[in-house]
Amino acid sequence: QPAIEENIEYLHCHKIDNVEPLDAQFDRMPALFAPEDIALLLWPDFPIPPNQLDFEKRNESAHTRNSAPQIDKNMQQRHLEHYTNDSDTSPTLKVYFVLDAKKIPFLNTLSLKGKMKSLFQGKFGEDTEKVAPYLIEVIRDENHIHTGEMMGLFSLKSAQHHFNWEDNLGIFIHSYADFETVYQHLRKFPMLQDERGKWFFFRFYDPKVLHDYLAIIAKRSAKLHKFFGYDNNIIYAFGLGLGNRFYYYTLKTLPEETLPSPIVMTDWEIDGFKTHKWLETKEYLMEYTLQEYPQLYSEENKHELCQNLEEGYKKGYTYEISILQYALAKQSAVKNGIDFIALEEQVTKNNTAPLERAIKLCSLLNIE
């Protein structure tokens, strides 16, 4: 894997905005399994029945409000040709869900019609059965889709299903491959080594982690090759829900010379996660500061706030509170005509720990 990024992103990311998780649906018959736009995306050939309780529209078919996802036609053809057999029927996309068992308290009572299997096996699998990731087959049976046991994946907690949208329980996978093929592919990733051989858990099945990870490797064809199972056309798409959005990721055709990367979490990937975390932290700190410290920062000098937070982070203040205190102290010093550089040097002589320095700076400048 080269150290530099390529100049092209090899992912299409389709977003469905303003997702409204389902409620108990007492006013709909039959109840929906997913909001209509998501249902039409994940089950494109699966008709959504009209609401029989809506007498004005009970004979109307559902229509998506969002544009269709952008799909690389060559990739689509690759998958279709790979899974087409001698029969006249075309292969259909299957929907799988990777469940984070750590987020549900009732795993031992869960009994599903579809296949369900922990990505951890053997003694380790037994020891981690309550916290492991599980691959689940989401059955394409009409009764199951609308009233079945996986009900709740797109619902509010108040709907009182086993599953819910709000807890980010896992990720969706679109694939033409059978359960065992997808399962064996995914088993490669929950535990990875870094470049120094240290093992750690890689929670790619957490929607937030997958969202960040795909952004990190979007320009790394070798990483995408391995993660999607490109040679064998295993993963057609990843899907995930975050907040009020649903993301659907498909792969573009990769350069012919692309080889799959080793299954290692490289330093640049780890740095990518750190960068994403910092950007989110900075955004939160900016919003908080503008609200709580209007005497120091406003929309007019928001750029200075961003610079000062970034400066504090790069100076190693590390903790959120110490980065915030650094930005507050610097702006207060500027407003009061105090030489902040000299003040910081003076404080650093007696306070080597970043948190102690930040507290002392705020104390000297009377910031609470």
Which role fits each region the language model picked out?
Residues 1-2, 206:
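Short, well-ordered amphipathic alpha-helical segments that serve as non-catalytic structural scaffolds
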